[in-house]
Amino acid sequence: MNYNIRGENIEVTPALKDHVERKIGKLERYFDHSVDADVNVNLKFYNDKESKVEVTIPMTDLALRSEVHNEDMYNAIDLATNKLERQIRKHKTKVNRKFREQGSPKYLLANGLGSDTDIAVQDDIEEEESLDIVRQKRFNLKPMDSEEAILQMNMLGHNFFVFTNAETNLTNVVYRRNDGKYGLIEPTE
């Protein structure tokens, strides 16, 4: 894995860098072979009482992301790594369940699940949470700009809002971030 460690309001010391690489490097044991992925780690230090660690590992068939707030930076790194490990194990369980259901490795390879991000089989499989859809809504997407979409989202009291961007005529999503600001998701066409 290639590590990109960035600090905001904190100097990334060699000890901090070693801790990140050592902890996140342990995740490689879940993969059959060496993972060629860029690990993006943002370390943010707000004050004496709060630090934040964001870890993103984009891979071909899986994107891992973890965000943790904690008083201690090292503890936050440990907790973020634990979250990533749970995500990997959950994905591994899903792949293994599909493998058992289909009954043959040929099916997995034919359907693209035998790619370079296969998760190594281990005995300690966690049960996957239920992914039942409990409500479904249908509505027409009104063309609008992102500011109007944010106003609509706030008026409805939602954390996100799907709309058709009037400028690009593509479906976009605005969402409220944890820091109170807003984000926009756009397709790449």
Swiss-Prot record:
Ranges that cross the membrane: none
Example of a GO cellular component annotation carried by this entry: cytosolic small ribosomal subunit
Molecular function terms, GO-annotated: ribosomal small subunit binding
Main location: cytoplasm
Effect of loss of the gene: The expression of a sigL-dependent gene (levD) is up-regulated two-fold in cells lacking yvyD, but the relative amount of the sigL transcript is not increased. In cells overexpressing ppGpp synthase YwaC, deletion of this gene causes loss of 100S ribosome formation by dimerizing 70S ribosomes.
GO biological process: negative regulation of translational elongation
Induction: Expressed under the dual control of sigma-B and sigma-H factors. The sigma-B-dependent promoter drives expression of yvyD under stress conditions and after glucose starvation, whereas a sigma-H-dependent promoter is responsible for yvyD transcription following amino acid depletion. Also claimed to be under sole control of sigma-H.
Subcellular location(s) per record: Cytoplasm
UniProt xrefs under Pfam families: Ribosom_S30AE_C, Ribosomal_S30AE
Alphabetical list of SUPFAM superfamilies matching this protein: Ribosome binding protein Y (YfiA homologue)
Keyword Cytoplasm appears in the UniProt entry: yes
Extent of the signal sequence: none
Keywords, sorted A to Z: Cytoplasm, Stress response, Translation regulation
Taxonomy, superkingdom: Bacteria
Similarity comment: Belongs to the HPF/YfiA ribosome-associated protein family. Long HPF subfamily.
Primary role: Required for dimerization of active 70S ribosomes into 100S ribosomes in stationary phase; 100S ribosomes are translationally inactive and sometimes present during exponential growth. May not be the only factor implicated. Might negatively regulate the activity of the sigma-54 factor (SigL).
Subunit: Interacts with 100S ribosomes. Not associated with 70S ribosome monomers, about 1 monomer per ribosome.
PANTHER family: 30S RIBOSOMAL PROTEIN
The protein's name: Ribosome hibernation promotion factor
Lineage: Bacteria, Bacillati, Bacillota, Bacilli, Bacillales
Originating gene: yvyD
